[in-house]
Amino acid sequence: MRRKSLPVLFAALLFSAASFAKVSLEIDGLEKELKDNVDAYLSSIPESDYSTQLRFQSRLQKNIVEALNALGYYHPKIDFEVKESGEVLAVHVDAGEVTRLELVDIVITGEAENDPDFIRVISQSGLKQGEPLNHGQYDSLKSSLRNLALQKGYFNGTYIASRLEVAPELNQAFVRLHYDSGIRYQFGATSVEGSQIDENRVASLQPYKEGDPYLVSKVGEHNQNLSSTEWFSSVFVEPDLNNLDGGRELPMRVSVAPQARNKFETGLGYSTDVGPRGTFKWKKPWINSRGHSFDSSFSISEPEQYITAGYKIPLEDVLHEYYRVQYGLKKVDNRDTQSLESNLSVERHWLVDSGWHRTMFVRYLIESYEQGVLDDVGQFVLPGFTFSRTRARNSGSLITWGDKQTVTIEYGSDSFVSETNVVRVLAGTSWIRTAGENHRGVFRMGGGANFVDDFDKLPPSLRFFAGGDNNLRGYDYESISPRDSSGALAGAKYMATGSVEYQYRLAGNWWGAVFVDGGDAFDYTPRWKTGTGFGVRWVSPVGPLRLDFAWGLESDPGERFRIHFSLGPEL
């Protein structure tokens, strides 16, 4: 008796071991869309549950049938085959004939009947007579119409009929969606609670007028406008649905809380241009009920120290039109340049409809300096203007698409304070483009020109120097310019630089980069310098951290290789 039971026990143990061995699935017979949907349904099953047992096969069949039903296939044939000694469960699927839409009856009534957005959503839904049934398209359209109604102020909208009927034996499906939107509400009076700023200033940030059709995007824009002023620590804009008076005007309620009167910020940084750097910032986001503000910053590094203070006076268009008065004091001790620069400027800012930011300014510059063999004090009054535009689309803190253009022209005359007649032109452009998820291109061009009667009377801050982390990699910071009779750097009348960089995603937020930089700072004829190399980028919350290994091809032997490290925005 015992001898007979041993083989039975041994077989049972083998069967149990096979049942718990790791099993993989092979599914064939399905086209890509069907295969993808089946995979999505099966993703809820942990691989540890995979088995060749009949119970698991039944579970698997149920999920596959549900996945195929969702795309209109109600007559699938599913066969299972255990292969490779129980290590593979093969699933052979014949999806069968597809169920098609025999009737598509979609009707919008109410004030949204001729609304182009509703018409567009319906036309793009994919629900058309004769097309294969897709439950996802039906569910998506149903929720899209409801969401669109809420976004556009049809708050009383309701479905009169919403049915999807399937006759599997006929391979036919019938869609009935009848939606009554009701009336469309309009923006009514707006009330503001908690504001310390003048009522008219706050009202100017409202992107809609009383009586305009309701749009949730306008509510979001209003919220963003209020936040962008930095006057408030919290902002909440919402329709006051509890105070409807039976008409179509929807009261709006704005709740804000004042920002702190003083904000302080400290920071430590490092770049190979200036070495370790410490910063301190003090800001008063609002000074009075008219929304005036004050900001100041102090930065110290070994070659450069500066302090700035600015006072901002917003105008009727609070965010885009304002006056700014700024004073800055900067000390430089770098290579052959020692200077103490004092700048006082008055600026008028506008944003034009095309997205360009326009600034008209006049600045008063006094600079005491030693530049090579020159030792002097210069003063200039420089009126001018700047046009700039920045466009960007972000994925987190990484710019996936963007560009920036800046042009500045300023003029000084020896008939009014300035040491010599000078016209200065500065221009720059940067472009970022992304291909797919793993490829980025970064392109930069920049330059400047001094059209001057007596170049020797220009202080260092008005001359050009090239080289450094953000200019010409492979060369030291501001190490490129013509030299004077003593061999010291003298600064240049002109400068032109450019850069081409390709980046490839290595993993997650890590990117590799290869680049070529070129340019020169010169007086008459450029002698182009080239820097090339490779680097690593890490996308941090405050912008990309960049580590580059660069070779300056025209550098002196022994000085051609340089490491560049920097952190900050790419545009």
Provide a role label for each language-model segment.
Residues M1-V8:
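Bacterial N-terminal signal peptides that target proteins for export
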Residues D117, L215-T406, G441-F443, N470-G474, ...:
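Gram-negative/organellar outer-membrane beta-barrel architecture
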Residues P526-F534, W538-S540, D548-W551:
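Strand-loop-strand
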Residues I108, G194-Q196, P314-L315, L340-S345, ...:
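Flexible, surface-exposed loop regions and adjacent strand-edge segments
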Residues A21-E33, S43-T272, K281, D295-I313, ...:
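Periplasmic polypeptide-binding modules associated with outer-membrane biogenesis and secretion
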Residues E370-V373, F380-L506, V514-G518, F522-D523, ...:
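C-terminal outer-membrane beta-barrel translocator/porin domains of Gram-negative envelope proteins
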Residues S16-S19:
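N-terminal signal peptide c-region/cleavage motif recognized by signal peptidases
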Residues Y73, K330-S339, G412-N421, L553-E554:
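Outer-membrane beta-barrel proteins
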